Amino acid sequence: EKNVLFAGRKSGHVYALDPDKQGELLWVKRIGKGGFAGGVHWGMTTDNKNLFAAIADTNFINKFPGEPTPGIYSLDGLTGKLNWKFTPQDRCAENEKPACDVGISAALTATNDLIIGGGFDGWLYVLNKDSGKLLWEYNTNVDFSELAGIQAHGGSIESDGAVISGNNLLINSGYLYGGRLGGNVLLNFEVD
């Protein structure tokens, strides 16, 4: 079994390095157009065989050329070969753009069978790890009644990814920095 160190950049490039050979480059692949609000933002994950990367590639400021390729990517960890790509559906109303965008920026979370990621548009996605098939999705960009009876609103899923603890999936929703969809809720889903 080979040790591999993965890195991602806002340029849209992902890298595999050999830590046993002073960081020798094993492969590099560009999966996003990159730019100020593009590429890899907060973190990737692995299942010790494949690399899973979130690509933001938002058109937030329209300063970078090229076609955006937002989504979740699965790459073979040893070769960089694309296993699958999940492209979110654009559900943003024109009056919500550019704050609402289908880019996936938050760190991804992996379990034995699943990849979990969330988007600038507030949608949370649960995918089959092996095929990339969408298994479940939930819109967090809505109003919620908190336990204390106070109204709260979700928004963009950004920065930290989902946390799995026992039978619970925790995710924060709402991230105003950079003109995204503000809000502030911590959601707890029961996982079967």
Where would I find each of the regions flagged by the language model?
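Extracytoplasmic/lumenal domain signature
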Residues: 1-104, 109-159, 163-192
